[in-house]
Swiss-Prot record:
Modification(s) after translation: Phosphorylated at Ser-90, Thr-99 and Thr-104 by OXSR1/OSR1 and STK39/SPAK downstream of WNK kinases (WNK1, WNK2, WNK3 or WNK4), promoting its activity.
This protein's domain notes: The RFXV motif mediates binding with OXSR1/OSR1 and STK39/SPAK.
Region annotation (Disordered) ranges: 147-169
Protein name, per record: Solute carrier family 12 member 1
Membrane-topology descriptor: Multi-pass membrane protein
Length: 1099
């Protein structure tokens, strides 16, 4: 409610007996403006006694008008000085009270912000983003008070008026039903079927009044629990069309929804045939009585059924409005028929009816019929199985949820009331017919007996009839024998026949509409892509005409087959499977404890819903065990199919919520478990940047973390935080989606930082969750380090130092061509854009050539000129020109091949493990895990260790013993005894030439000059440093010679990473070590664990 200054608004109408604080807004006269600002009265407070329960405190605001406020702003007295502060505040408080939400960039809560894109209930509006209300305003931009916010809060929103008018037009054009016509009527018609008129009397005869009522109540319990679950799900958010399918799919996900939706739609389609055949059989019986058969009973049923289903199709195609009118008419007929039965029970019975077992209400008959009298082959559960389908139909209203004005209110109210009314009617009919009609009667008026003569002691005997011969020979009348008992008892028999017609036709019509609506919703979700054709709707109500035709074809086929006795149990089980899943959906959503599960309908319990699901499954087997098995098998195969296809939908199902809860519980439980070496697994940070830019680095890491460890692809955005955060946030979902699309079970994480090292340091400290915290850093080798800026080298080596500081293992991967293919991706993207533009240009020209009356070629060029279509040309500085000059395909071929080398099967070969230093076993564990993978399983492990020349055999035996205790299979062990000898002169000369540009050579200069150079270039390699680590430098050069000698042909080399002591070895010297160590080799993994055991030989 808005408070306008020009109108007088009083809030005195608010009930005062419940308020302790009341605000009275009283409009003052316009003359108050002329009096000046200082004359504005402050809020007036009226105190009341504490004994006054109606009001404790009243505040009366006396607002002025907008003109007064504008004049006040123009006076310039807006500064909050001591003299004016009170005046300013007392006056403008009123203004801000009236315009809250329109004087701030923040948007006030509106329903439009929470709609989905393309919502049928109204347009979606985007609220101002957090950046828009948080970032600094642009300079030299004048901001008028309140003007910046009118769009955000709905004033002057572009196209808003049009959208609202359009929404109103849509609402005016589409036919929407309330809870009575839309749900109550449909559910009652669907629940009241032919069972009410032709089977309920037989059920009372078999089970008796007592157990008959129990059967009705047990069936009602199943449907009532399902109704409660349906109501809870339907009130947990906006419900669209699709009925049971929509409720199940949005709760349990597309796998369950897609499988049950298809069989539910099919069951409704076949149910049309069942109801139509029931109608046709009744008509054929009437034709028999009048001797008016057309061909024979079977073919007459087919003819009448076909004509009937065509008429029903015509009513459905005419639109939901006509269908609803037909349902109302059928309900009226049905109610008259039921009332006709109850009236007939009090009309005195004649001799003919008495001979057929009807004696009006008799206590003796009630007592006799109260207990069961099951005939041969029948029992409680068999009778229950026959009655239960009569209680179904509770989803008839929910199935047209898209055509309801307010599904959240209509479905709970209409469904539960329909269950109650129909249950009362069933119980009433059962009790009445059981109190009026005996179980067996001959139908012969000659079976009367003289009063007082003892016969068989039955109730009929006491009423003057002897039906004892029915014990020895079959009789035609009575509850057990005559299916037309209700027609006999009723006041006017033909009305019961009309009721049967109404029950069958209304159920058939409801099933026809339900099948088409559910099927259309299923097809719209594109879960089964081949069925997309049936998703199209027509007219203002989006009528599924194609679905109607398909349902008609299915119904016609089963009418012509005329083998419904076989298919009927399966159809009943299909419905029960839907009920079971609806109950399980309600339980599952409650059990998942998702904050999004907050149904407005609170009369439900998750354990009751679970009991209902189990009860539905049990009833399925009670009705027909083989039909239940078939139902489960069909549903299972559809579930597997949908799971395999993985439809691209995200409905926030409870399955997703439970996955989160399960993961959270497991993660929390994991924190209580102490680390143990047997449970160690590599959990890796991988500095891939965008995962698509360094696929080879990700592939090799994923090879030893797949299904056994954690893999996080990390990217650091370096630069101004404002720009970096925007770029980072915009690409995170896309990069995670790339991992999913490429079936890589990994996570993507990104940070924004001022420098690369700070970003990685943040990742090293903060990534992971509890025990699921990465313990290994995987980085690519910096191939072009000699051309890189010094800061990049310092950051690169610093990252390795940081990892060791945090006790995290390090793996450096080197391949000959390098990892980064971002340039290739950029070129590919540019080429794709050019190709799209070229195709668009050709399509436009082709369209223009096809048009007539444009003056031939001249007209074509004129039109192209008007369209301003020109052949795109690349920019001067674009990557296209660069690639063209360097022959892009040939230039990048090796890089592209290298980027996919770890995706391929490696074939027979070796993984050479140079386990030179004991780091806890990570250098050995990673290659062992690789050999377990399908792509690496043909590669054998060859182990190389250092040793003494005079103890090679002993150390080889010791290593073999250790590996066998670790249960690691290996092909060979080599003990290298000459690691510490000096490398050859050529190798050492290459190393010296490589580090020459970075040496300080302070020994050749005087002391002052040397000290000055050290201060100016502290990053250079000093002679003292080089001399101190000369033996280590020899070792790196010598190791490369040994690697060239022994492992040149290996598929992969895993080598102990040398550690550079902080403060002793400069960054450039360390990079020189790594360069000379891995030069001219197959792919190399330099590995260094955190020196904590990752292998054990204890059980």
């Amino acid at each position: 409610m808005s408070l306008n200054n020009s109108s007088s608004v009083f809030l005195d109408s608010v009930p005062t007996n419940t308020n302790r604080f009341q605000v009275n807004v009283i409009n003052e006269n316009h003359e108050s403006c002329a009096a000046g600002i200082d004359n504005t009265d402050p809020p007036h407070y009226e105190e009341t006694s504490f004994g006054d329960e109606q009001n404790r405190l009243r505040i009366s605001f006396r607002p002025g008008n907008q003109e007064c406020y504008d004049n006040f702003l123009q006076t310039g007295e807006t500064t909050k000085t001591d003299a004016s502060f009170h005046t300013y505040d007392s006056h403008t408080n009123t203004y801000y009270l009236q315009t809250f939400g329109h004087n701030t960039m923040d948007a006030v809560p509106k329903i439009e912000y929470y709609r989905n894109t393309g919502s049928v209930s109204g347009p979606k509006v985007n609220r101002p983003s957090l950046l828009e209300i948080h970032e600094q305003l642009a300079k030299n931009v004048a901001v008028t008070p309140g003007s910046a916010d009118r769009v955000a809060n709905g004033e002057g929103m572009p196209g808003e008026e049009h959208a609202e008018n359009k929404e109103e037009d849509n609402k005016a054009g589409a036919v929407k039903f309330g809870w009575v016509k839309g749900v109550l009527v449909r559910c009652m018609l669907n629940i009241w079927g032919v069972m009410l008129f032709i089977r309920l009397s037989w059920i009372v005869g078999e089970a008796g009044i007592g157990l008959g009522v129990v059967i009705i109540l047990l069936s009602t319990m199943v449907t009532s629990i399902t109704g409660l679950s349906t109501s809870a799900i339907a009130t947990n958010g906006f419900v669209r069309g699709g009925g049971a399918y929509y409720l199940i799919s949005r709760s349990l996900g597309p796998e369950f929804g897609g499988s049950i939706g298809l069989i539910f739609a099919f069951a409704n389609a076949v149910a049309v045939a069942m109801y139509v055949v029931g109608f046709a059989e009744t008509v054929v019986d009437l034709l028999k009585e009048s001797d008016s058969m057309m061909v024979d009973p079977t073919n007459d049923i087919r003819i009448i059924g076909s004509i009937t289903v065509v008429i029903l199709l015509g009513i459905s195609v005419a639109g939901m409005e006509w269908e609803a009118k037909a349902q109302v008419i059928l309900l009226i007929i049905l109610l008259i028929a039921i009332a006709n039965f109850f009236i007939g029970t009090v009309i005195p019975s004649n001799n003919e009816k008495k001979s057929r077992g009807f004696f009006n209400y008799q206590a003796s008959i009630f007592a006799e019929n109260f207990g069961p009298s099951f005939t041969k082959g029948e029992g409680f559960f068999s009778v229950f199985a026959i009655f239960f389908p009569a209680a179904t139909g509770i989803l008839a209203g929910a199935n047209i949820s898209g055509d309801l004005e307010d599904p959240q209110d209509a479905i709970p109210r209409g469904t539960m009331l329909a269950i109650f009314i129909t249950t009362v009617a069933y119980i009433g009919v059962a009790i009445c017919v059981g109190a009026c009609v005996v179980r067996d009667a001959t139908g012969s008026m000659n079976d009367t007996i003289i009063s007082g003569i003892n016969c068989n002691g039955s109730a009929a005997c006491g009423l003057g009839y002897d039906f004892s011969r029915c014990r020895h020979e079959p009789c035609q009348y009575g509850l057990m024998n005559n299916f037309q008992v209700m027609s006999m008892v009723s006041g006017f028999g033909p009305l019961i026949t009309a009721g049967i017609f109404s029950a069958t036709l209304s159920s058939a019509l409801a099933s026809l509409v339900s099948a088409a609506k559910v099927f259309q919703a299923l097809c719209k979700d594109n879960i089964y892509k081949a069925l997309q054709f049936f998703a199209k709707g027509y007219g203002k109500n989006n009528e599924p005409l194609r679905g109607y035709i398909l349902t008609f074809v299915i119904a016609m086929a089963f009418i012509l087959i005329a083998e419904l006795n076989t298919i009927a149990p399966i159809i009943s089980n299909f419905f029960l499977a839907s009920y079971a899943l609806i109950n399980f959906s309600c339980f599952h959503a409650s059990y998942a404890k998702s904050p999004g599960w907050r149904p407005a309908y609170g009369i439900y319990n998750m354990w009751v819903s679970l009991f209902g699901a189990v009860l539905c499954c049990a009833v399925m087997f009670v009705i027909n065990w083989w039909a239940a098995v078939i139902t489960y098998v069909i549903e299972f195969f559809l579930y597997i199919y949908v799971t395999y296809k993985k439809p691209d939908v995200n409905w926030g199902s409870s399955t997703q919520a439970l996955s989160y809860v399960s993961a959270l519980d497991n993660a929390l439980e994991l924190t209580t478990v102490e680390d143990h070496v047997k449970n160690f697994r590599p959990q890796c940070f991988v500095l891939t940047g965008g995962p698509m830019t360094r696929p080879a680095l990700l592939d090799i890491t994923y090879a030893f973390t797949k299904n056994s460890g954690l893999c996080i692809c990390c990217e650091v955005f370096v630069g101004p935080r404002k720009l970096c955060v925007k770029e980072m946030n915009s690409g995170m979902a896309k990069k995670q989606a790339w991992l999913i699309k490429n079936k890589i079970k990994a996570f993507y994480a990104a940070v924004a930082a001022d420098c690369f090292r700070d970003g990685v340091r943040s990742l090293l400290q903060a990534s992971g969750l509890g025990r699921m915290k990465p313990n290994t850093l995987v980085i690519g080798y910096k191939k072009k380090w000699r051309k890189a800026p010094l800061t990049e080298i310092e950051n690169y080596v610093g990252i390795i130092h940081d990892a060791f500081d945090f006790e995290i293992g390090v793996v450096i991967v080197r391949i000959s061509q390098g990892f980064d293919i971002s340039q290739v991706l950029q070129v590919q993207e540019e080429l794709e854009k050019l190709e799209q533009e070229r195709l668009a240009l050709e399509a436009t020209i082709k369209d223009n050539e096809c048009e007539e009356g444009n003056g031939g070629i001249r007209g074509l060029f004129k039109k192209v000129g008007k369209l301003n279509i020109t052949k795109p040309t690349p920019k001067k500085d674009s990557s296209i020109n660069t690639i063209q000059s360097m022959h892009v395909g040939e230039f990048n071929q090796k890089l592209v091949e290298a980027s996919t080398q770890f995706k391929k099967k490696q074939g027979k070969g070796t993984i050479d493990v140079w386990w030179l230093f004991d780091d806890g076993g990570l250098t050995l564990l990673i290659p062992y895990i690789l050999t377990l993978r399908k792509k690496w399983k043909d590669c054998k492990l060859r182990i190389y260790v250092g040793g003494k020349i005079n103890r090679i055999e002993e150390e080889k035996i010791a290593m073999a013993s250790l590996l066998s205790k670790f249960r690691i299979k290996f092909a060979d062990i080599h003990v290298i005894g000459d690691i510490n000898i000096k490398p050859n002169k050529e190798s050492w000369k290459f190393f010296e030439e490589m580090i020459e540009p970075y040496r300080l050579h302070e020994s050749c200069k005087d002391l002052t000059t040397a000290e000055k150079l050290k201060r100016e270039t502290p990053w250079k390699i000093t002679d003292a440093e080089l001399e101190a680590v000369k033996e280590k430098s020899y070792r790196q050069v010598r190791l490369n010679e040994l690697l060239q000698e022994h492992s040149r042909a290996a598929n992969l080399i895993v080598l102990s990473l040398p550690v550079a002591r902080k403060g002793s070895i400069s960054d450039l010297l360390y990079m020189a070590w790594l360069e000379i160590l891995t030069k001219n080799l197959p792919p190399v993994l330099l590995v260094r664990g955190n020196h904590k055991n990752v292998l054990t030989f204890y059980s």
